[in-house]
Amino acid sequence: IRLFKKKKVDIFTNNLKKTYPKGQSVEIINSDIILKTLNAVSKNKGYKEHVTSYFYANKRKFKIHNFNLKNNISSINLSIDTLFDFNFVKKVIELSDDKYIGLNMLIKIHNKIKKL
């Protein structure tokens, strides 16, 4: 949030160039921008469920800042859509020594699981 405020942008995201694990997407949108574009967004059925698609489709109209990691770890999947995904995340939790799993620990555990 601090970086979003500091950059003074309309949208602050990690979705344009994906470097974070799947399931770890972040989109912070200035509420004034949402209010200003509500009418345009509501007219298109395609944007009703995924409002942010409107901003990306019209990115020349908005100040969008993408933040990313130096090391791309987007191949790691933390989204739970299947039983396989669930079992992977369950294994990550089981292999963790702590309740909090930071990014560096996540990478270590992921690499450990890949070797199993």
Q: Where are the regions that the model predicts?
A:
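Conserved donor-nucleotide/metal-binding helix-loop-beta segment in metal-dependent transferases, i.e.
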Residues: 1-19
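Short, structured loop/turn "capping" segments at alpha-beta junctions
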Residues: 10-13, 35, 44-48, 61-65
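Conserved alpha/beta core of the MobA/IspD/sugar-nucleotide pyrophosphorylase nucleotidyltransferase superfamily
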Residues: 29, 48-116
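Conserved short-loop catalytic and cofactor-binding motifs
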Residues: 22, 39, 74-77
